[in-house]
Regions:
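Low-complexity/repetitive intrinsically disordered segments
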Residues: 88, 95, 102-105
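N-terminal leader/linker segments that initiate helical-solenoid repeat arrays
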Residues: 1-9
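Short helix-capping/linker turns of helical repeat alpha-solenoids
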Residues: 19-22, 35-37, 42, 55-59, ...
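Leucine-rich, hydrophobic repeat-scaffold detector
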Residues: 10-24, 31
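Hydrophobic face of amphipathic alpha-helices that form TPR/SEL1-like repeat modules
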Residues: 28-35, 64-71, 100-105
Length: 105
């Protein structure tokens, strides 16, 4: 899987890109919110950003969204939804999603 991930000069620049629809920025903003990096930890808001990026086929966001459904972070725990998002990501070659999908079976 090619590493063509973007980087931003500041958190504010990343947030602006996310708000403008950049899927990678949305994914990273979700990670920041999930982990409380640079912002207050907020699982529900993290899920919102993961979903925006996942709906644009971002495999990292799809994997994180699957993890949220697996663990019940920010959403009700739903193994079927976890599998759905891990599968979407795994089909794009994400190794973490492939591992997590395998663990569900």
């Amino acid at each position: 899987m090619a590493n063509n991930r973007k980087s931003w000069a500041s958190f504010d620049e990343m947030r602006k890109a996310a708000e403008e629809g950049d899927a990678q920025a949305q994914s990273y903003l979700g990670v920041s919110l999930q982990n409380g990096q640079g912002v207050a930890q907020d699982y529900q808001e993290a899920v919102r950003w993961f979903r925006k990026a996942a709906d644009q086929n971002d495999p990292v966001a799809q994997c994180y969204l699957g993890f949220c459904f697996l663990t019940g972070q920010g959403v009700p725990q739903e193994y079927g939804e976890a599998a759905r998002w891990f599968r979407e990501s795994a089909e794009q070659g994400d190794p973490a999603a492939q591992f997590n999908l395998g663990m569900l079976y």
